[in-house]
């Protein structure tokens, strides 16, 4: 038996998230259908985590096990021939049988992209959230520093989040300006449901002068989503960039 690790890129616009569910088309479902067609039978695919409806990925990691002796290049090219245009396997490699993409992950890097422009951009509408008006980016950067470290992120999760613990560690959080685009890059041990989107919404309110760095610190000391943390920004600006594993 072989354990095949895939690095997957996808445009999440048309999907109800990563994980298979009864109420809509998902990325995992499309990949498992392609695997079944290529390998001649149902094959379970295990991902490094979930992304919500409309969220994208450049570096989702997933694994499947097979006894097929195909070369690795054939797995990648075969799947890409069967997958729709909005999903692609970027890499395929063989890993030890005990490797699990979720449980062995050390950290994840997410990026949220904002378009700071009073005029709408048709070409960016599916990969960035447009904001009108100016933001105090320096104040937002100061607030980013408050999130770094281990904190209880209960105030920065969806109301229906079912995680057993809300403590997470953020390794780095940076804002990168690229022309009219402002990217929030967050690297952490793991993330609660909607956590990055709520953090982004909170930082935007700091940039608009509606919240202060002290407000952010106070929210991190609380344990209730009802504390008036920031809005949950739309999903299209969010992208899973990379998942990190031990060398």
Swiss-Prot record:
Pfam families: PseudoU_synth_1 (PF01416). It comes from the Bacteria. Keywords: Isomerase, tRNA processing. One of its GO terms (biological process) is tRNA pseudouridine synthesis. GO terms for molecular function: RNA binding; tRNA pseudouridine(38-40) synthase activity. The active site is at 52 (nucleophile). Substrate binds at residue 110. SUPFAM superfamilies: Pseudouridine synthase. CDD domains: PseudoU_synth_EcTruA (cd02570). Its EC number is 5.4.99.12. Homodimer. Belongs to the tRNA pseudouridine synthase TruA family. Formation of pseudouridine at positions 38, 39 and 40 in the anticodon stem and loop of transfer RNAs. This is tRNA pseudouridine synthase A.
């Amino acid at each position: 038996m072989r354990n095949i690790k895939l690095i997957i890129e996808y445009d999440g616009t048309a999907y109800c998230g990563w994980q298979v569910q009864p109420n809509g088309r998902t990325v995992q479902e499309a990949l498992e259908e392609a695997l079944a067609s290529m390998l001649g039978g149902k094959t379970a695919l295990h991902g490094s985590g979930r992304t919500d409806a409309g969220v994208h990925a450049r570096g989702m990691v997933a694994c499947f096990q097979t006894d097929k002796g195909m070369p690795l290049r054939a797995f990648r090219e075969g799947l890409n021939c069967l997958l729709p245009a909005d999903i692609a396997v970027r890499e395929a490699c063989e890993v030890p049988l005990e490797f699990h993409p979720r449980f062995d992950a050390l950290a994840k890097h997410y990026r949220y992209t904002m378009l700071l422009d009073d005029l709408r951009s048709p070409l960016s509408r599916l990969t960035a959230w447009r904001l009108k008006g100016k933001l105090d980016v320096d104040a937002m950067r100061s607030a980013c520093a408050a999130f770094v470290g281990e904190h209880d992120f209960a105030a920065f999760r969806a109301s229906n989040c079912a995680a057993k613990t809300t403590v997470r560690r953020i390794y780095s959080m940076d804002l990168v300006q690229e022309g009219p685009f402002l990217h929030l890059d967050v690297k952490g041990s793991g993330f609660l449901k909607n956590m990055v989107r709520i953090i982004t919404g909170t930082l935007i309110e700091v940039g608009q002068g509606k919240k202060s760095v002290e407000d952010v610190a106070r929210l991190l000391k609380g344990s209730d989503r009802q504390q008036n943390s920031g809005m949950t920004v739309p999903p299209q600006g969010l992208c899973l960039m990379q998942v990190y594993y031990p060398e």
